[in-house]
Amino acid sequence: MVPSRRTWNLGATPSLRGLWRVGRVQEPKPGMARPAPASPAARPFPHTGQGRLRTGRGKDILPSGEEDSTSRTAARPSLAQCRALSVDWPGPRSPHRLYLTVQVENLKEKLISQAQEVSRLRSELGGTDAEKHRDRLMVENEQLRQELRRCEVELQELRAQPVVPCEGCEHSQESSQLRDKLSQLQLEVAENKGMLSELNLEVQQKTDRLAEVELRLKDCLAEKAQEEERLSRRLRDSHETIASLRAQSPPVKYVIKTVEVESSKTKQALSESQTRNQHLQEQVAMQRQVLKEMEQQLQNSHQLTVQLRAQIAMYEAELERAHGQMLEEMQSLEEDKNRAIEEAFARAQVEMKAVHENLAGVRTNLLTLQPALRTLTNDYNGLKRQVRGFPLLLQEALRSVKAEIGQAIEEVNSNNQELLRKYRRELQLRKKCHNELVRLKGNIRVIARVRPVTKEDGEGPEATNAVTFDPDDDSIIHLLHKGKPVSFELDKVFSPWASQQDVFQEVQALITSCIDGFNVCIFAYGQTGAGKTYTMEGTPENPGINQRALQLLFSEVQEKASDWQYNITVSAAEIYNEVLRDLLGKEPQEKLEIRLCPDGSGQLYVPGLTEFQVQSVDDINKVFEFGYNNRTTEFTNLNEHSSRSHALLIVTVRGVDCSTGLRTTGKLNLVDLAGSERVGKSGAEGNRLREAQHINRSLSALGDVIAALRSRQGHVPFRNSKLTYLLQDSLSGDSKTLMVVQVSPVEKNTSETLYSLRFAERVRSVELGPGSRRTELGSWSSQEHLEWEPACQTPQPTARAHSAPGSGTSSRPGSIRRKLQPSA
């Protein structure tokens, strides 16, 4: 600090900025201990009176807020000491420092009083009526718990009594209702406990919030007090510096006057003194400038003090508002808590009263039920005595029942033997009747199916319908050709609206004949695009004749599994450009030939034709999926996927009767013929032209065979085509044959439709004679002696019942081969 009285040393005069810098350095840093306050005698300002501040004009100023804080000055000795000083301020703005100090002390006292008020509120909160009421409720809850425990003990005692429950008893229902009410009361008590804990938690949260607001206010007031202290120190240092400068001014003047009366000997010293004097004047001007800056800073401090007062007032108002809100919320919570507790207590009292009343009724009912319990106990003892003698009665009854059951089993066995003999006799009769029915229907049955009109048929006159049906006779079809109606009579005619199942109903009788040991052939005929492949194969969602025939075949085999053992093998081939190819072989392009068996039996077989043994329809589908991909189809003007070859699906069924040893061999040939077409209309060129020529040539050979059979010629030209040669067994009286004629209904295809229907009529008039059944009577009758021929890629027959030449059952010693003719 700069001392209040100091003599200037002219030899080393410091600048005013340096003095100000020294005063700033001596100021204590934050966190360091402040020096002890100077005594009144050492202070630079003498005091004039008690509690008054004297200004430079001699007026007394009473500090604001003194009358309001006189009751609390005894607890603050520093404030009393500050008021006891009377300072003679050198400047017109000097009283503000002490005034600010007084205001700071007043704020501190207010903070202390507020802290005391908060602690008083906390002490009052500890003993409010709400908490007393809460304690009282806790005591009441404890009493209710004791009452509930006592009721539970009584209920357990009642349950422990040996009471026999009775269904529909009014007392048991009341007891269950009481138990339900008791559980509800327990739940409500638990809910009341939860509500009470929530209210206590809310009160604790409000108290914590108030404490947090008080801490923030204390921190703010402490910061403001530190700022006031710092400004006070700077103001005090400034005044001390000004006072010291004023005190040193007279010696300078005296030196100047003394220099004026000196002799000439000291002129040199005079000039030096003048230089120093000029330097001192500059320093005085600088000090005046610094003084102005200090006054400006003092004014800024005054403005800052005003702002701090406004903030303090705002904080006080906020604290008061928060305090009021807290009191209102606490009062509201207290009221809600009291109201909830009263409602819960009243409800608990009412329900507890009802529980006590019901419990008394239950006790009365239990007392009335004791005689009934004694009666039931006596009845139970009597039943127990009867049960002791029950095992003897049960053993006697079991012996008699066993004897009756044994006698009944013997009678059933004898009846079963008789029924088995009758069943076999009826089975043979059914086969004879079925074969007779098929024979009476005709050797080659012909059915026609008309496909619907499609978008590929186009529009205009050529796409009009030229086919009509007889509503009274489903075997007649009418065709309008060149303006003239032509009628045809077949075995069955199906309209475009007929389903795949309707068509298959005409076929399923032949499948049964195949299982019985007959050769069956089903083939589709018609122009390309007439729907032959759809009728034979169909789609996965709506299968055709092939899939349905195989499903029926395996279904019939499964039904006869208890009496017969069957072995089913399949093979597939196609005739493409008069070349026979194996669709299931490893090399589908390999050419195969049709040979006669060298044993002289007249049977035909195809060397190298692949044959697979199957157990279900799924096995067949997996095998034929590969074969279907190998079949030749191409695009023509008449059909996008035109079949360019004749496809044959050959299924061989070999069966053995487990009881008689009778062996049967049936073969099912499913043939999808390639479509007949006119070369000019189908647009065939190159390979397509050569394919069409071969297809038409083979179908023409088929027509020649049908014509020879119809006229009963001695020589039938089966060898003119691979197709007719392969179908020789199916067309020579050794098979049951069905032909499906597919026709198109539109006007532009009437020529092909007319040709197909005429060919169908010629086929229908052919008489082949009754079909023969392939059977062999073995020399054994038990299933354990059955031997199956393995299914492998060896030469297999394609049109006869046996699989290979010389390997059939005819070469087995002691076997008999005969044909069973159906009785007329």
UniProtKB/Swiss-Prot annotation:
Minus-end microtubule-dependent motor protein. Involved in apically targeted transport. Required for zonula adherens maintenance. It holds the Pfam family Kinesin. The modification Phosphoserine is found at S811, S815. The lineage of its organism: Eukaryota, Metazoa, Chordata, Craniata, Vertebrata. It comes from Mus musculus. ATP binds at G526, Q527, T528, G529, A530, G531, K532, T533. One of its GO terms (biological process) is Golgi organization. Its main location: cytoplasm. Gene3D superfamilies: Kinesin motor domain. Predominant expression in the kidney, testis and ovary. Also expressed in brain, heart, liver, lung and uterus. The gene is Kifc3. Residues 27-79, 771-824 are annotated as: Disordered. This is Kinesin-like protein KIFC3. Residues 443-766 form the Kinesin motor domain.
